[in-house]
Amino acid sequence: MRNLFKAFIFRLRKDLTFRITLIVGGALAVGLALILFFIDLGLKNVDFDMKLCTGQTLFVSSLSPAQNFGLAVPINLITFTVLEFTQGTIRNKIITGNSKTKIYFSLILSGIVFTLLLMFAYVGLCVGLGSIFGGFDPHGMVMGLVNGTVSPEFLWKIGVLALLAYIFIAVMTIFFASLIRNVGPCIPIVIILIMIFYFGGTIASVMSALGEILGDGMKNFLLAIKYIDPLYSLAAFSSEVDPNTGASYLAISNADFWTEVINNLIYIAAFTLGGWLLFRKRDVK
């Protein structure tokens, strides 16, 4: 398996798709930071004190699996993985004596590395540019779809959940890419699932805030979504109000955090095991 992973790293260094994705991610990060920076410059003229282009704002916003680069990563991973089958790379690995178990788990490991390398580069550049233009304050304000101050606890919690979420997305992507082995149908399936998980959590969170207006059946349904959606807390972290100051702040409760950690680990294990079992039974042409 070590040799298979080394072969993946060697191919990745020469892969045009990976390089193009890195360039696109860099361009998107620079473009986003510049847009927010110039908006901040314009808002200075109307006495708007809050900054949009800050390290903490870009950190939180860049983690979303539903934003432009978050969706580009699984699309490119699908292409990369399907080519392993269509170009005969997987078949050659079997011919040279590698077991299907080693091959599939090397695909999983390679997919995770592929995904995390791209996301670390993108998020790191976003945070770096935001920090240069507007500073980074671990207790500062985040401006976006949800506004509020952050804390070091919130930042590390959402960072851990994002890490697990992208590992889950990578494993799910490898599952469908190795099962379908065709880019055409695989891309919409994966993207639709990501959007359902992400926006399903957002909608469920908004509806849950209605409280007593909802009936018991709807409350139970929304609670079930919370426990089965692997992207729930990443999409639906709450904006709380400090009763003493009236200021809003972003928070992920310990219960929600550990629910999502366990949830993601279960999904990762299920897709890995299911994909491995299916891969062992299918012929590779």
What are these regions (language model features)?
Residues 2-3, 19-21, 25, 237-285:
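Alpha-helical transmembrane segments of multi-pass membrane transporters/translocases
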Residues 10-26, 184:
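Membrane-interface helix starts
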Residues 28-34, 192-202:
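Aromatic-anchored segments of alpha-helical transmembrane domains
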Residues 1-6, 163, 167:
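Short, membrane-interfacial amphipathic segments enriched in basic
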